[in-house]
Each structure stands twice: as structure tokens, then as C-alpha cells.
């Protein structure tokens, strides 16, 4: 039986969504610079005839696949929205208007009004920042190695909080808020362990991304912010940072179970619906 798959070729990761033999939605993930592994996997799936591809590296991958498959290309923002809408329905959310923050290699932020999306903005701070700083500061360069260390790390010896500055005096804002990411490293000599450094890197990224998302949400008086992206996958530390900061500003954070695969899901659904 001929089949269709969706591919989201991102800056760092390439995600694949397809229906297995039991018609269950299934995912695969590869590093985007490992194109040989992607092609080898595709060759083993002999039933695949059509691929809907999206993402920043879609053109590069498409050039390698166009002779073997029927290729449909889809704008990555459209694919992501289709995927997010599908996941929201599957997870029983009834939300039409929200801010969508996609934390990939960098971070893009959109306003979503029903099935219409408007780009609000973005930042170069994202998953690529986490991995770049992790490599520079600890020489750890695999996301899978960063996550477990981050879980046991602490930011208290590296970040300066509002409470640190006010020193017990009543402050105008919450003492636990970060006044300066990595600020203590400039004034306190210490051999910081990798866990604390990695936790602080994620704190920096999480707070920058959340602050920007909150500003956009507040501008349009939107109450829900949906955070997606592979950077959040199994990353409880980063999710907790984002969640607590979002709630502090009286907005509702939502993390979708398969949010990191939303682009690939959207590509699959688009091609499947178009085919039918």
C-alpha cells in the first residue's frame, strides 16, 4: 500500500511523521546534518511514494529526494499551525486565539486567530543558544547529555536575583526574579560545576523567550501562550522556568505533548488531505 509521510527539516533536527501499519501516528527524528541517515531510513520504508516537506532545510533535502518520491512543499508556518490545531483537538483543548511560541534553533512567535496566523516576531535565542553556550562553557555538545545534568543543576550561585540586590530590604518586585543571568560569575571566583552552568544557560534562554512571548501576548490582550519545539522535549527544567514566569504575569502556558513534531504532523495532514 502506497503511503505518504510528512517531514519537517529544521535547522538542527529533522522530524518525520507517518502512520504505521496500525494507522497510529508515529515519529522519527534525525539531526539535520545527518542526511545520509535520513535517506537510509526512507529507503527502508518501501511503501513511501509521496513526501510533504517543510522547514528551513526543506529545499536542501528536497534536492536529494526529488528523483525518488513525489514531493509536496509546504510553508513551515502553515504546517506548524495545521499540526498545532490537530494536537489541540487531540488533547481536548478548546482555544481559538493564542500566542504560539516555537522554540527551535531560534525562536519564532505568532499570533493565532482561529485558522489565521500573523508573525509577531522572534529572537535568535533558542535551542541553538542552549547548545552553543553548553558547548562553549562545558564542552557538552549533545542535547541528550545536557538534559539530565540540567535537572540536578542550580542557578543560585550564578544568577543575581532581585533579592540579592536588595539584600533583605523590601523590593518593588518579587525577590526571586532574575536581575542578571550569570551575573555572579563576574564577581565571585568559583569552580562552577557543569550542572549549574547548564541549568543557568537554560534559565537565560527560558526567561528571554518567555519575556518576549509575554510582551506580545499583553499587547493584544491574549491570555494563552502555547510553547512548542523540540527544545522542550523531555526538558522539564526549561518547561518549569517558562511556566512559572508565564503564570507570574497572569497568562496561561500550554505545553503540547507532541508539540516538537507539529510541523511534521502538519505536513503529513496537508498531503494526506490534498491526496484524498
From Swiss-Prot:
Q: Which UniProt keywords apply?
A: ATP-binding, Coenzyme A biosynthesis, Cytoplasm, Kinase, Nucleotide-binding, Transferase
Instruction: Spell out the molecular function terms from Gene Ontology.
Output: ATP binding; pantothenate kinase activity
Respond yes or no to whether keyword RNA-binding is given for this record. Answer: no
Q: Indicate the principal place this protein occupies in or around the cell.
A: cytoplasm
What the protein does comes down to: Catalyzes the phosphorylation of pantothenate (Pan), the first step in CoA biosynthesis.
Oligomer and partners:
Homodimer.
Task: Spell out the protein name for this chain.
Answer: Type II pantothenate kinase
Q: Organism, per UniProt?
A: Bacillus cereus (strain AH820)
Q: Which gene encodes it?
A: coaW
Amino acid at each position: 500500500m502506497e503511503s505518504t509521510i510528512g517531514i519537517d527539516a529544521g535547522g538542527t533536527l529533522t522530524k518525520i511523521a507517518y502512520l504505521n501499519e496500525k494507522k497510529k501516528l508515529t515519529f522519527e527524528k534525525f539531526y539535520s546534518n545527518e542526511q545520509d541517515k535520513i535517506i537510509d531510513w526512507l529507503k527502508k520504508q518501501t511503501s513511501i511514494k509521496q513526501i510533504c516537506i517543510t522547514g528551513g532545510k526543506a529545499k536542501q533535502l528536497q534536492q536529494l529526494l526529488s528523483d525518488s518520491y513525489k514531493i509536496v512543499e509546504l510553508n513551515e508556518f502553515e504546517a506548524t499551525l495545521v499540526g498545532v490545531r490537530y494536537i489541540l483537538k487531540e488533547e481536548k483543548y478548546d482555544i481559538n486565539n493564542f500566542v504560539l511560541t516555537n522554540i527551535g534553533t531560534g525562536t519564532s512567535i505568532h499570533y493565532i486567530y482561529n485558522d489565521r496566523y500573523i508573525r509577531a516576531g522572534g529572537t535568535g535565542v533558542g535551542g541553538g543558544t542552549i547548545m552553543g553556550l553548553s558547548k562553549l562553557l562545558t564542552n557538552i555538545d549533545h542535547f541528550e547529555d545536557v538534559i539530565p545534568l540540567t535537572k540536578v543543576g542550580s542557578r543560585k550561585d550564578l544568577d543575581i536575583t532581585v533579592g540579592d540586590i536588595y539584600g533583605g530590604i523590601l523590593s518593588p518586585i518579587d525577590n526571586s526574579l532574575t536581575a542578571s543571568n550569570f551575573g555572579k560569575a563576574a564577581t565571585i571566583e568559583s569552580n562552577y560545576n557543569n550542572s549549574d552552568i547548564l541549568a543557568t544557560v537554560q534559565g537565560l534562554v527560558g526567561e528571554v523567550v518567555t519575556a518576549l512571548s509575554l510582551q506580545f501576548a499583553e499587547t493584544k490582550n491574549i491570555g494563552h501562550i502555547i510553547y512548542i519545539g523540540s527544545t522542550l522535549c523531555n526538558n522539564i527544567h526549561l518547561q518549569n522556568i517558562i511556566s512559572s514566569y508565564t503564570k507570574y504575569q497572569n497568562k496561561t502556558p500550554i505545553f503540547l505533548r507532541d508539540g516538537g513534531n507539529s510541523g511534521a504532523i502538519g505536513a503529513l495532514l496537508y498531503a494526506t488531505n490534498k491526496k484524498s
